[in-house]
Amino acid sequence: MNLLLNYELFLAKIITFIIISISILILFYTIIKRKKNIQSKIKITLLQDNYKNVKNKILLSTMKNVEKKIWFKKQKEKNKKELLLKNNKKKLFVLDFKGDVYANEVVGLREEISAILLVANKHDEVLLRLESSGGVIHGYGLAASQLNRLRQKGIRLIVSVDKIAASGGYMMACVADYIVSAPFAIIGSIGVVGQIPNFNKLLKKCNIDFELHTAGDYKRTLTMFGNNTESTRKKFCDELNTTHKLFKSFIKEMRPSLDIEDVSNGEHWFGTIALEKKLVDQIGTSDDILISKMEEYTLLRIQYIYRKKILERFTASVTHNLSETLLKIFFYKNYL
């Protein structure tokens, strides 16, 4: 009896060992396979199919069986004709940009625009579905410059704002040949903000010294812990005004008909008022644009998919959320 129990125990250990070994091998294989598959790529989606599938489902749900047979027969003939005309159709490339403080989406935007420029001709168009409340000037300046590549190549750019294109977001939008805004989308905020807390008095109360040494009078203007002077404050304000002038001149260059002095006081407006001020060209939504162009254009959504490792994704998410929170509390200079 003891021998049988010992044998069963030994057998259980062997089976457990085999299961653990196989699990470890599977885990290693999965990790190696994932590493091979971790690569960035351009994803292309034919948006026509989505709209047509929804439309057809609704139509079929209202038909009788006899009507369905007739409809399917007509649809086959229609599909054959569309297949012949497909290559001659103009293309509408659809991009999405949901901006954060640093305009990190510009990494994908530059790749998407480069891909479009390789295949697009002057009859094609680009629709950018934009959503951004602005951020750092160098990030949004680069994003606007990427969009300007389309303009320089003579490819018509339409920007659709369903929710918000303010400050740096509007810097991007103004590059477009045509701006469409939802009635209550937030538009404008053409201004620059800079603010920073100063803990110098608190440090003195706690008997803590803070030393700051620079080579160059304006290597640092306002600091969080140093003693800020009137001259450094003036320099800080001068930098903000210089940035604002550059911002205004860029918008004026892109939209010459705009009364820049009237709209560049940092104020924002809803879409309907923005139309009156010529900040946008039409009231509508991105869905209106896509449906109106569905018959004439082939709708292609272009997405840059950046594959990250699990650890990289986690650390990037934590860092991004932390920096977003801190920047919302402590705004600093050159902030659109």
UniProtKB/Swiss-Prot annotation:
Name of the featured protein: Probable protease SohB
Keyword presence, Transmembrane helix: yes
Membrane topology classification: Single-pass membrane protein
Major localization listed first in the record, in broad terms: membrane
EC number(s) from the headed UniProt entry: 3.4.21.-
PANTHER family: PEPTIDASE S49, PROTEASE SOHB-RELATED
Subcellular location: Cell membrane
Cysteine pairings via disulfide bonds: none
NCBIfam families: PRK11778.1 (NF008745)
Name of the gene: sohB
Active site as annotated: S167 (nucleophile), K219 (proton donor/acceptor)
Membrane-crossing segments per the record: 10-32
GO BP field: proteolysis
Keywords (A to Z) from UniProt: Cell membrane, Hydrolase, Membrane, Protease, Serine protease, Transmembrane, Transmembrane helix
Entry annotated with the keyword Cytoplasm: no
Organism: Buchnera aphidicola subsp. Acyrthosiphon pisum (strain APS) (Acyrthosiphon pisum symbiotic bacterium)
SUPFAM superfamilies: ClpP/crotonase (SSF52096)
Entry similarity comment: Belongs to the peptidase S49 family.
Gene3D superfamilies: 2-enoyl-CoA Hydratase, Chain A, domain 1, 6.20.330.10
